Amino acid sequence: MLNVEKKMENGALFIALEGELDTLSSPDFEAELEPLLAEANSITIDFEKLGYISSAGLRVLLAAEQAMEEKGAEQVKVIHLNDTIRNIFSITGFEDILSLE
């Protein structure tokens, strides 16, 4: 299960995720995120309460990054990663694709 909190302010989209971003929750998250991409000039995603991410979740993040890049916007920023998820980002090369803090 994934809980998503979103806040848009002056084109800056902030998203807080709680739970698991997996094969079951990724399509719903993508559907929530997609319409906001047109308005956003920056995206920050807070992983503080995210316990797990699958390859399907990584794909959603990659699509968001590509959409932002295509319109010349800022790189997607991911904050508060736990050690396990940071390791997944390192192994998959996502640490070079997204901005991690």
Q: What are the roles of these predicted feature ranges?
A:
Residues 99-101:
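Short acidic-hydrophobic, aromatic-tinged amphipathic segments that line or gate anion-handling sites
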Residues 1-16:
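Short beta-strand/loop segment at the start of cytosolic alpha/beta domains
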Residues 23-97:
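Amphipathic alpha-helical interaction surfaces in cytosolic regulatory modules
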